[in-house]
Amino acid sequence: SRNVKEYGNRVYNRYPARSIFLVPRAILSHQADRPLNVLDPFMGSGTTAVETVLSGNVPYGLEMDPFARMVAEVSSSIFTGEELIAMRETFNTICANWIDFESEHIPQLTGIERWFKDGDLDLLLKLKSAILSLSPQRFLPFFLVTFADAIKPVSLMERQSLKPYISTKYAKITKDVLSSFMYSFEAHM
């Protein structure tokens, strides 16, 4: 699944349950006589919603996981050219100013600090504060998903594993906060 983009997949986040886009694409390609309302009762990260939008149909989905709902919302959103320019400007503003923000919005998770090198959690929280303060409401879900995707490369958690652990055998070389966020932004644009 490392090269799924080559085959048409739109990977907006490494959400563990994303499905293969070819199934909804094949089904929707045989329903071309009129626009459809498509219900996905287990929406996950929105693969069916994306294919539904791309085929000119209207997606509806149900998902209990709030993060998965946000990923699905972002992945199936259509932005105008002007909005894409505004998103880039917002991104540039965040990148230029994030370091001056306070480390707020600390997750109430026991032992969260152990997953990061010294100082990295503080830097991530500064970036999150900047995103929450500087992003227009229309773009906020996009920037939050981009931020979420940037966390794992900064953390000590193994990137290729869905199981959360820190390898004691092979020390992970982490990315810095800003370059990880920039990489995620470019990958999602």
Label every model-predicted segment.
Residues 38, 49, 59-61:
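A short hydrophobic/small-residue beta-strand
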Residues 45-57:
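Conserved SAM-binding loop of SAM-dependent methyltransferases across substrates and taxa
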